[in-house]
Swiss-Prot record:
Its main location: cytoplasm. The keyword Glycoprotein does not apply. It is found in: Cytoplasm. It comes from Campylobacter concisus (strain 13826). The keyword Ribonucleoprotein does not apply. SUPFAM superfamilies: YhbC-like, C-terminal domain, YhbC-like, N-terminal domain. Belongs to the RimP family. This is Ribosome maturation factor RimP. One of its GO terms (biological process) is ribosomal small subunit assembly. Gene3D superfamilies: Ribosome maturation factor RimP, C-terminal domain, RimP-like superfamily, N-terminal. Required for maturation of 30S ribosomal subunits. It comes from the Bacteria.
Length: 138
C-alpha cells in the first residue's frame, strides 16, 4: 500500500483507500483518490494510466479484474485516523459492536473521535469502530 501511495502522489493526488470488490462474478480493484479542491476526471485517468501497466506485470488480485479509479464521494467510508481528521465538521454514522451513533464529527485524533448529536457528545475509540461513513442530510 505504501508503494501505491507513493506512485499515486506522482499524479498530484493522494491515495484515500483501495478495496477489492466482486460484482457479477467479476473482481474489481477500486482505488479512491483525493486532493484539495476535489478530484477531476483527468486525475482519475492519470492514475489509471499510471497503474494499469504496473498491474499488468504485478496484478493486485489473482485472475481477471477491472481497475476503477474515483474519488471516495460525498458519502464515503471512514476507516483510518486520517479519514476521520479530514472529516471533522461533517455528519457521520458510526457503528461499534454495541451501539450506533449519528451526528456531527467534532473531534478526531489518532486514537479516538467525538460525535455530537441532540443526546450529547460521544467519545469513541477508533479501535472499537466496526463501520463509519459520512452522510448528507437532504
Amino acid at each position: 500500500m505504501d508503494n501505491l501511495d507513493k506512485l499515486i502522489r506522482e499524479c498530484g493526488v493522494e491515495l484515500y483507500d483501495s478495496e477489492i470488490a466482486n460484482e457479477n462474478g467479476r473482481a474489481i480493484f477500486r482505488v479512491y483518490i483525493t486532493k484539495d479542491g476535489g478530484v477531476s476526471l483527468d486525475d482519475c485517468e492519470k492514475v489509471s494510466r499510471l497503474l494499469s501497466p504496473i498491474f499488468d506485470v504485478t496484478p493486485p488480485v489473482s485472475g481477471d479484474y477491472n481497475l476503477e479509479v474515483s474519488s471516495p464521494g460525498l458519502e464515503r467510508k471512514l476507516s483510518k485516523p486520517s479519514h476521520f481528521k479530514a472529516s471533522v465538521g461533517e455528519l457521520v454514522k458510526v457503528q461499534t459492536e454495541a451501539e450506533k451513533f449519528a451526528g456531527r464529527l467534532v473531534k478526531a485524533d489518532e486514537e479516538s473521535i467525538a460525535v455530537e448529536n441532540e443526546e450529547g457528545i460521544f467519545e469513541i475509540n477508533i479501535s472499537e469502530i466496526k463501520k463509519a461513513k459520512t452522510y448528507l442530510e437532504w
